[in-house]
């Protein structure tokens, strides 16, 4: 009887549609990468134990988002590059890569990336095989990140769960960014963030999801929103403490990019000004 029950439960779980996303609303310590990594590992293990297939941490989580002048007024470029930034193939990122493989999950992390003599505000997505599935560097800022080089590409990654794109924090306030990802085929957009959150942000994130027909995960140290392609919040954080927010995303053929087919791109050439 017990064996039958276990088999039944397994069959139901296996048949459940979509994929389970875990948004980690975690507040890191400035400059304390070892402590932040230990906390990430602890929460990622909890999320994976509860069935998460995709785990997302906030913007700049690894180093504590010290690259923003509002957070670190006395920051210098030399200190930022030397003490905050990490190479994607360095020891700490290799450890996180191994964690994704060990837990058999997709794991997204925000960090200051050292690359080609510059520093980028980057979100990297590691696959369940421990490989780099995607890497996106923040392309829009409010001039409060003077030592970060702006990214210039919006990659869309094909996975077994669908096509995924990434924006970082202020990128989300520029509507063209999410639209470009949708036009490139993204059905889910991950938005690791740090700055503003609250009622107006909740509305904006729902609009971004609805107007582009995409699932959207907003992951902030004090706020998480998981929104489906109809603009409905399917899960959200409670309070502002460290926590995990779970939500199941599906790719609906009916809702995916629902509004895009009515566009008339030939009328919008003025948008490139």
PLM regions and their residue ranges:
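Sec-dependent signal peptide recognition
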Residues: 1-7
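Hydrophobic h-region of N-terminal signal peptides that target proteins for export
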Residues: 7-15
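Short beta-strand segments enriched in small/hydrophobic residues
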Residues: 17-29
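Hydrophobic/aromatic beta-strand patches that form the interior of the parallel beta-sheet core
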Residues: 22-24, 56, 108, 134, ...
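Solvent-exposed loop/turn segments at secondary-structure junctions
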Residues: 27-30, 61-64, 114-116, 142-143, ...
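Cys-nucleophile CN-hydrolase/nitrilase-fold catalytic domain and related Cys-dependent amidase chemistry
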Residues: 33, 42-128, 179, 198-210
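CN hydrolase (nitrilase-like) catalytic-core segments centered on the catalytic cysteine
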Residues: 85-106, 163, 172-248
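Active-site catalytic loop in hydrolytic enzyme cores
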Residues: 98, 114-184, 203, 207, ...
